[in-house]
Amino acid sequence: MSDHDQIQAVARAAALAGGAELRARYRDGDTEAEYGAHDVKAAADVAAESRMLPVVRGAFPDHAVFAEEAGEFAGDGPYRWIIDPLDGTNDFAAGLPTFASSVAVLRDGEPLVAAVHQPATGETYVARAGEGVRYDGDRVAAADARGAGGAEGDVAGATVAVIVGRDVPRDATLAAEADALRAALGDRVKRVLDSWAPTVHSGLLARGRLQGLVQFHPDEEEQAVTELLASEAGAAVRRDEDLYVAATDEATLAELWSTLEDADR
């Protein structure tokens, strides 16, 4: 087994370990949480992370790690792990099944491996640079279900997820810009999905169930996963500073990008 094979296996195992904790709490109705004006923190975040960290640290004690709850662990070498024990905390606390445990691994700052496990549905995505995306073990691509959105570039029937970073609602100017982006998309596509679980909806894009994904000031915990799932699934992507767009094909990307450029912000 190569180093990258082992990293991929450990990332998947860590995501599954966190997911097992979340699944047990979700089924028991244990969604205890502290609610703020713009965010929510569930006890399950800490519990799931406590299951994930030993998997990673036990296998690679010298690697740098950022865990959403525990913070930074210094390390040597080119690898850095990003652990998000509960992506979609608001949905989890509300009893919605759209949440996941995710792990990303960067090599020299670039996404190398991503693993996402959705406990409520038992779905697992694993992506690796140069190796594509696997959904429950099978290779998938963003173009697999293109017909759901019509012909290439025909976004009138498209479903597009919009993801904003945690700082956006706290800043009136950024919040207004995000609203303008949503409004512009709403006038152009069939459905704008306001995503509170970026890794879940990134997986849907990776297998063509969504036609587009828009991220505005994305959070680090999810962005590495999103980028790797999109690129390895063959999605068309474009970034300009704090705006990132991925789509099932180049024509759809061009239409979405043009729509966002014309937004009143």
How would you name each of these model-derived features?
Residues 75-137:
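DPxDG-like acidic metal-binding loop motif
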Residues 1-86, 261-265:
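N-terminal subdomain of lithium-sensitive/metallo-dependent phosphomonoesterases centered on the IMPase/IPPase/PAP
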Residues 22, 45, 56, 89, ...:
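Residue-level signal for inorganic ion chemistry
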Residues 24, 28, 141-142, 165-168:
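Acidic/histidine-rich helix-loop elements
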Residues 33, 73-75, 108, 152-154, ...:
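Solvent-exposed alpha-helices and their adjacent loops that cap or buttress functional pockets
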Residues 132-135, 139-141, 251-255:
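Short helix-loop capping/hinge motifs at secondary-structure junctions, enriched
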